[in-house]
């Protein structure tokens, strides 16, 4: 007779027939199958007899459950047996989750960075510090809570099994991904920080300081990147305010020393009519030219200090999660006004100079906008800023580049238009775009400018481009800056919008999931022998998993749409998200309608591995399979476009950065398929043996390829991946000594119709002697061999990592370290 049971954790308890009866009865109640008390008694007795037949005094809980399932089936209660199995699986899932939580907390609190991938899943957030460990415990616990309670069981299993990856699972039930913050709007009108109202700044220094505050406050109410899509346009008005202050100071000083009036009439009234955006020669007609010169110089110094402070703050405000600076990005380059150009020039200058210790600033990610007529060609007004950006890139990794006028970005660019009647006027003094020069232009000759050369002042310091002079009319246009594409540093972007304005400002990605494409290819390879059969099976599986990802993303959207304005006191109540302040609202109002301005994205990794598994060929080498690879992403993009029409939400296709997921997918698949006989004809090292899957559609990093070939292979994917993409190519040597080569490469990327791109390199610093260059085992200058004295800066996805506190060898997860080992072409 059985007297004891052994639970799964090894504990022993007294055997109870009543518990067997209760378990069977509970299963019956979940079905419509009829049963009697006699049926229940017979079932229980049969179970008891079966577990007692060997004479054992103690049995395991799982053995009893196995007998219950078998007995129910034998007695014909099939539905009840199925229900009992489901109940058992659910209990196992709950039990396993609780066990996982304990194991995870133990790993976080008792491991170090070198031994724990959990502590290194984000290269710019250390899990080793007290605040970091505390955050990791909360993060990992909420991941498990979401898998257990908030996510459909099917999708949770697919995530745990590695078929898909639900990104930022720790924030699944809390908030959204990223946002292009309307920094200019908040600076112009002031904002409530939560502890008090901050009025509009009156100088560039204060504006830059408040910009860091805005980005920091917003980053705490989301989980992804925070960006300003046009920092030059946003900060330019405050450069002008500083100029007027500085000019007034110089004028007063002039009057004190000279004893003569510095200007004709009332000084304060006159200052209201001028702007630093106006040509210097006009300002010199109103004020002593030395006063103007000194005011401009002082304003430039102020702007330089402001940009230094902005970069410094964004590298030191570790308030996000108590252990992380805001994942910030600044887009710039298209403002051709004097004030806007001063912002851009000093942003580049400050990045070039580095932080206080001369090291490279990891944040913010600087992104320079390339566009013909503005920045790209020698005749463009901001071409000089492009040249400076290239010099900065060669020394400091940043800026990255976004092509505003690519074939897939240009259609979104919009202009305001205005017509000025100048009939009867023979000529006008017009400002040359981006310069202080003024030229006399005859207006009685019709001319249309393909690339506008001149500007016309329509308000104090506000200049519009002259697109044409026709029949005595000036046809003016002004770029609407937030219709020009911007990107988060990692690559995420938004632009198209079926629910409102097609702009970047005030919008962002809500959530994205990534599909493990190599998993589908592994299963297709095992199921068929011919390439065509494998392709057919692969695409069938892809369609099925796309439906599941759609369902999971819609569930996530529904969950966060139930959040209220009080959940996001800064984002919603201060009007950062587009339409959030269109109408009066109560703090208990839900935010679902506002979130319809954002996007849901489906990402992918492992095109390189898929090509090998399905065709046996090498991505980026055998170009006869290019169409097949492209058709995979076309399928995902088509699906996203279809869902946009069906659900009336913004869906987009994403070339996943794959920081943590690259290694996770590969390790799961290695454990699952490494010994499969049907994969014996595959070089599994090229698939998951190397420890990671290749980012999105990129050529395998171990392939030593040319720039031309890499562009030919990867460029066509950019027009398909409207949620974000990036292209980079690795150059060797000291790039600061070969700016022409850097320009040649960036120009080639621009010409290839890419959307977002940059070059990358290795960059090391020795803290012992200050050497900057490439350090192998020892510093070539002082001979130091202490790794802790070396700062090795590397690009991990779209952003950088590397500092004395977060050396790449300490902060990168195993998958990314394996990738770094293989890198030849990025």
Model-derived features: where do they sit?
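Short, hydrophobic beta-strand segments
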Residues: 3, 47-53, 328-329, 609-611, ...
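Metallocofactor- and cofactor-centric catalytic cores in central/energy metabolism, strongly enriched
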Residues: 301, 305, 613, 808, ...
